[in-house]
Amino acid sequence: MAGTVLGVGAGVFILALLWVAVLLLCVLLSRASGAARFSVIFLFFGAVIITSVLLLFPRAGEFPAPEVEVKIVDDFFIGRYVLLAFLSAIFLGGLFLVLIHYVLEPIYAKPLHSY
């Protein structure tokens, strides 16, 4: 089923986004004073109308079209392993240089105190 996330289509996410936005606006407008407070009613009924229109007039058919089996081919197989070999060589070379720097770090003699 194309265009689905977690087994549901885009319409469910549109309705969820609509109702989250409406409830957030209702909470914000309920704290307002004057005539703006009563706009919550119109906002709620507008969301009900939009939801009913989206539910009563679906775009897709009731039965989904049969899916065509897609054959997955890895076109970048060789390039991926060349890149892996190149990055592994860079990593090992860097590790070698760090260890050489660690082993060959000079140790300076501490000065003797002369009394």
From Swiss-Prot:
The record gives the effect of mutating R37S as: In JBTS39; fails to rescue the ciliopathy phenotype in a zebrafish disease model
Q: Which family does it belong to?
A: Belongs to the TMEM218 family.
Keywords for this protein: Cell projection, Ciliopathy, Disease variant, Joubert syndrome, Membrane, Transmembrane, Transmembrane helix
| Subunit architecture | Interacts with TMEM67.
> What is known about what this protein does?
May be involved in ciliary biogenesis or function.
Tell me which GO cellular component terms the UniProt record holds: cilium; membrane
Name of the protein in its database record: Transmembrane protein 218
State where it is primarily located.
membrane
Instruction: Give the subcellular location.
Output: Membrane; Cell projection, Cilium
